[in-house]
Amino acid sequence: MTLSLDSLRSAAQVYQPAVIDFTRRLVSTPSLPGLENEVAAIISNEMNKLGYDEVWTDQVGNVIGKIKGGNGPSIMLNGHMDHVDTGPVEGWPYPPFSGQIVDGELWGRASLDMKGPVACMIYAAALFKQIGLKPPGDILMTAVVMEEVSGLGTQHIASQFNAQAAICGEPSNNILRRGHRGKVELVVTFEGRSAHASVPHLGVNPHYAAAAFLSALPTLDLPQDEVLGASTVTPTLYTTDQSSSNVIPSKVSLILDWRNVPAESPEMIIAKVKTLLGRSLASRSQTQGCRATVTITDQEFTTYTGVSQLLPSIFPSFLLPETDRFIQQAHTALVNVLGRDDGVDIWRFATDGGHLMKAGIPTIGFGPGDDKLAHTNQERIPLAQMEEAVICYAALVLALAEAAK
């Protein structure tokens, strides 16, 4: 193992200029969800250039590269090709698609979320070919579509491959991550009876029912996890079926962003909201005659390959125990490679790791870059962390293969 790591470390240092160049090319190529085709082509070409044994693009547009190993456990490296919008370009210190390097950091949209980590993973898998070391089992590098809007790409991957373990490469400041809260998006709809605003007694105003529900929402008893913290629910968007200001709407809807801990399933969330609706609407005379419903939102997404899927707005939560053998092996490997013990942490946001765990694939998290900068106009990734990450990803492949035996 030590000999393997020394060889991998030496090869990773040689690769560093190429990793940076590759990341800059990825960052300079915009790839919003559903428009990842150009970046997918760049990634596919890079994998072929690096000598991957197999490279292909699946029906939804994910790019998969395989490094063939022995008969041991297969390990998946997972990262997404899409990114969020830049927002106002004038708010960026440097052009968001320039990939400009300033003071040892590479700037730009998706530099850390997550084209930099994807580049590091692609080169980490290639290290085994570079030094002629056959991994214990196959390495599957999966660069996926549409993580930012649905997780469609990884859900498809999880249904196609039976890897024995996975690394979700989202940024983590090169600290091992073992889980996160999930996300469930709900729409609560209140239906009344429309009328002219000058004769409100002829209608049933759904605004009052929505107000009663929102007033009661903070009283919900939300579960607490000693590691992940409490579940949270946040009202975000509010819409009506009217555009005229002198008409009582017949229907209003509000969106709830629910961040759930593993002990709280989507079905439990729906039941809680229904109970609260019944209680809050029964308490006020102004809400009589109003009907309320709650559902998990869904949306149809179309990939750049033309495949359309209707998916619910659910990102599963997960949490591996610190005593889990995958966490233990990964932590030991990182301490050995980095020469320091940064401990084990969690993410504060949802990732595709939840979809992998739901599919039964044990998943750890690790990636270069400060995740607090994701989705901001300060997004950038330290080159030093990228150099560390290449060797760390390779070491984690070996560690997870050992844990999966």
What are these regions (language model features)?
Residues 2-87, 251-255, 269:
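N-terminal helical capping/dimerization or prosegment-like subdomains
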Residues 75-77, 142, 165-167, 295, ...:
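Hydrophobic/aromatic beta-strand patches that form the interior of the parallel beta-sheet core
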Residues 64, 78, 140-142, 185-189, ...:
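Beta-strand secondary-structure signal
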Residues 116-219, 225, 377-391:
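Fold-level recognition of mixed alpha/beta catalytic cores in primary-metabolism enzymes, strongest
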Residues 2-3, 189-405:
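Metal-dependent amide/peptide-bond hydrolase catalytic core
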Residues 86-101, 178-189, 332-333:
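Acidic-glycine-rich active-site phosphate/pyrophosphate-binding loop
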Residues 73-143:
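Active-site metal-coordination/substrate-binding segment of hydrolases
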